[in-house]
Amino acid sequence: MKNETIQYRTAPTPIVAKAPEQRQAQGGQMVLTGYAAVFNEPTSLGRFNEVITPEAFEAANMEDVRFLIDHTGVPLGRTSAGTMELTTDARGLRYRVTLPETARARELYEAVRRGDISQSSFAFRIGREDWEQVEGRLTRFVRSISVVLDASAVTFPAYEQTTVEALPFG
């Protein structure tokens, strides 16, 4: 039986920003990059721990993923629009998003640059999971994700090991 429940995960990501005037003078864009998910890092979700396994994203649909703030609001990037890219490597699910020239995007960029927002998350639907007792604690191993719905810069992440940073302009 397929679980259609949307799962949200958040993680830390540092961002660096310049004022809009400096960006325009340098011809730069506001770009954030980071890890929305990390592999093989257990996190506590209350009554159980969770681990995202390296194979979890192999068959995931990532064709129309939105970049959000705290999993809500107007998208600030989107894979289907070509403004966000998602890749996986040995560490986890990495994103790179080019932010629009909007007040909300500038506020996010500055908050990340200052370190006020330093983590990320992702929303997904599970394709396959296994449950085990690990060191006396019930642990869910996410083996397959059917679809990734969003990657978000967040205030309160589930995974402390996630990252985000602002790339320099120019």
Where would I find each of the regions flagged by the language model?
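Polar/acidic, low-complexity leader/linker segments enriched in S/T/G and N/D
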Residues: 1-61
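Residue microenvironments linked to proteolytic maturation
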Residues: 7-15, 23, 31-33, 66, ...
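A sequence-level detector of short linear motifs
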Residues: 38, 77, 140-142
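Residues that form or immediately flank small-molecule/cofactor binding pockets and catalytic motifs
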Residues: 39, 72, 156
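Short, surface-exposed beta-strand-loop junctions and turns on beta-sheet-rich folds
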Residues: 40, 74, 101-102
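Short helix/loop capping segments that flank catalytic or ligand/cofactor-binding pockets
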Residues: 42-45, 77-78, 159-163
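A glycine-rich, hydrophobic loop/mini-helix early in the fold
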Residues: 53-97
